[in-house]
Amino acid sequence: MRLSIYSSILLLRAMCLVRPTFGFPATTCRCMPGDSCWPSSTDWAHFNASIGGRLIATQPLAQACHDPYYNETECQYLQKHWTLPALHDISPSSIMAAAVAKDTCDAFTPRSKPCAPGDMVVYSVNASSPDDFSRTIRFSQQRNIRLVIRNTGHDYLGKSTGAGALSIWTHYLKDIEFVNYTSSSYTGPAFTMAAGVQGSDIYNVANGRGLVVVGGECASVGPVGGYTQGGGHSALSSRFGLAADQVLEWQVVDGTGRLLTASPTQNPDLYWALSGGGGGTYGVVYSMTVKAFPDFPVTGVVLQFDTKNTSSKDFFQAVSYYHRDLPTYTAAGGMAIAQITRSSFLLTPLTLPNKTTEEARSLIAPFIHELETLHIPYQLNITQSATYLEHYKKLIEPNPTQLVQNGQYGGRLLPLNVIESNNTQLTEAVKTITQDGVVFVGIGLNVSSSVVGDVWNSVLPAWRTAALSVLLSTDWPAGANRSTMKTLADRMTSKWVPILTALSPDSGCYMNEADPQQPDWPQTFYGRNYETLYAIKKRYDPFDTFYASTAVGSGDWQVKTDGRLCRVKGNT
């Protein structure tokens, strides 16, 4: 597999010795289908030939549920599987999250309603090499077409799609290579992954070598894209840190078509930006090399209780006790995912690397004692697995988090001092938010310097003091009224997220699990790093080729009501 990755890299570097012209024409807005500047069918055919026939004219995934393409059998299949990421992963254009799909048709709107493309990309390049990246970048610039980057489309903020856009689709770049890595900062086992690799791919390969890597809780998420570039929390984060903390180097094609290596010693500014500064804006990553670690046994804890046989007061008192004890779990290397509603609590799971069942039981004993003192019935399951992959398949992969969680989203990183000094106010916040029908998911972890050491990257600084990454969500039933959903989205922005912000005014939010309408997103998602990241963006993407919602530099643009991407006046 090394030959596959690096032969492509050498080929593009040779081609770049004689560089074609890059850059956009001097216009305010990107071209859209129907515009006089939109490429003709002949233009598209010529471009397709230049990339070996890899251009795809996209079709809405749900068109089988709408006239004139209606097919009852296909539509029923789509409706049954619509919430499974795998259905969308293999599509070059499907928008997974309903909240950012806008007017793109889905499998549940009326059959008679036209299947509009909405914010779906118009064309997609099934990329097989860095050369495909470079040629697509150049074509998008010459023809003034919006360009986006996509692997699986696992995306709550709409970064991997756009009306009238051309997409670089990396999904079938699946090479994985084991590396004995040596550098001034790290010597040890590592893996180089191509851009289309998904979590399940690398977990299985690593397990086969007796190793683990830091990756997402959802098996379908692609580690190389926005997950790691945005920081990336993991069930192993309290042991090793965030995904961005593991990166040794990147191979990336920038906005001028150059294939670059980005590491602490080569193009270090680009390495720093890609490692936590957000995806889809500095360039198109072809591969990523990350640290790997010896495998270990893992103990998992699943705990649930509800209000069926207890009062709301006692229920939320128990929630308070859980948060009180959470730092003890994370200090022991544990990572906890707790889903809280107004009537239920589900810890699913608490992942404890290299701990025995006895150690796990001892860790949670104080919390269990509080539940019993409150006379709250509970269900507890403690399971030990011989390897991390076994634990993952038993307790993480079967979770509801593996489904497409349609809803309105918001989030906040809550510092450790909130739990230590303001746990009463935190409990009141959880109660107020969940009483409105909002689901509160608290991801408990410790990625402070005591865990990660002296790392050098652009991860949002608020992560280093965070005890909880909170994701809020509301329900989005099939066929939901979009006006009603927009009202809930606005309440997320104006009411529920601000409740958490008041608890942590100097913190921020995990940019991949956030409110798409976050009003102060540069500060909230990037903190003090934003201005430096913006300068790096301009250095490696001088023509503003790459745009993604809430990505660095996206404030220079605005999306019109028809989906057209235009420069904000004064930004040229």
UniProtKB/Swiss-Prot annotation:
Residues of this chain annotated as glycosylated in UniProt: N48, N71, N126, N180, N309, N354, N381, N422, N446, N481
Family: Belongs to the oxygen-dependent FAD-linked oxidoreductase family.
Annotated ranges, domain FAD-binding PCMH-type: 115-295
Any Gene Ontology biological process: patulin biosynthetic process
InterPro entries: BBE, FAD-bd_PCMH, FAD-bd_PCMH-like_sf, FAD-bd_PCMH_sub2, FAD-linked_Oxidoreductases_BP, Oxid_FAD_bind_N
Keyword Transmembrane on entry: no
GO-annotated cellular components: vacuolar lumen; vacuole
Keyword terms: FAD, Flavoprotein, Glycoprotein, Oxidoreductase, Signal, Vacuole
Molecular function as annotated in GO: FAD binding; oxidoreductase activity
Organism: Aspergillus clavatus (strain ATCC 1007 / CBS 513.65 / DSM 816 / NCTC 3887 / NRRL 1 / QM 1276 / 107)
Free-text function comment from the UniProt entry: FAD-linked oxidoreductase; part of the gene cluster that mediates the biosynthesis of patulin, an acetate-derived tetraketide mycotoxin produced by several fungal species that shows antimicrobial properties against several bacteria. PatO acts with patJ in the vacuole to convert gentisyl alcohol to isoepoxydon. The pathway begins with the synthesis of 6-methylsalicylic acid by the polyketide synthase (PKS) patK via condensation of acetate and malonate units.
EC number(s) per entry: 1.-.-.-
UniProt protein name: FAD-linked oxidoreductase patO
Gene3D superfamilies membership: 3.30.465.10
Lineage per the UniProt record: Eukaryota, Fungi, Dikarya, Ascomycota, Pezizomycotina
Subcellular location as annotated: Vacuole lumen
Pathway(s): Mycotoxin biosynthesis; patulin biosynthesis
Biotechnological relevance of this protein: Patulin was originally used as an antibiotic and specifically trialed to be used against the common cold, but it is no longer used for that purpose since it has been shown to induce immunological, neurological and gastrointestinal effects. Genotoxic effects of patulin with dose-dependent increase in DNA strand breaks in brain, liver and kidneys have been detected in mice. However, more recently, it has been proposed that patulin might also have anti-tumor properties.
Needed cofactors: FAD
Keyword Signal: yes
SUPFAM superfamilies in the record: FAD-binding/transporter-associated domain-like
Signal peptide segment: 1-23
